[in-house]
Amino acid sequence: YLLDALCKIGRIDLAYTLLWQSKKPSWLYEVDAGGTTMWENCNGYDDDGNPGNLSFNHYAFGAVADWIFRTVGGIDTKAAGFKHLRIAPKPDGKIRSSSRSYRTEQGTVVCEWNITKSEKKNIFSLHTVVPCNTVATIELPDGTVHDVGSGEYRYEVEISL
């Protein structure tokens, strides 16, 4: 939960730096080293390329996938059963678009966004679907917040990266 902790103290920039880091210890080191599962720790191989004494199929660092879904993908919950959603993607500039959906008992939640450049401005566009019998708090990267009910919503705001 390191990435969540960094976000809670206002250091989303540091969370993204850690996410993108490919030196060990990091998540991308595992990918660059050929990993297709989560390892028990981030230092799976020593400097000579020999595997350490650990599990190469272990969820110890799996919280990164959840963080990506909630922070990059923008879909989170504010109440049990996804009856009150939090739609709050937090782009870092390296990722220019995301499309996520999640099936709940009330229906499918959709959060799709992209960043385009227009006249030297970065325009963040969001499309989201809030299922029936559900409410959502939509938090845009420019700081504006919208409390909405079921429906389909589109927003465009200028952001700095």
Predicted regions and their residues:
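Conserved small-residue packing positions in alpha-helical repeats and bundles
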Residues: 2-3
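Non-catalytic C-terminal accessory modules of carbohydrate-active enzymes
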Residues: 13-161
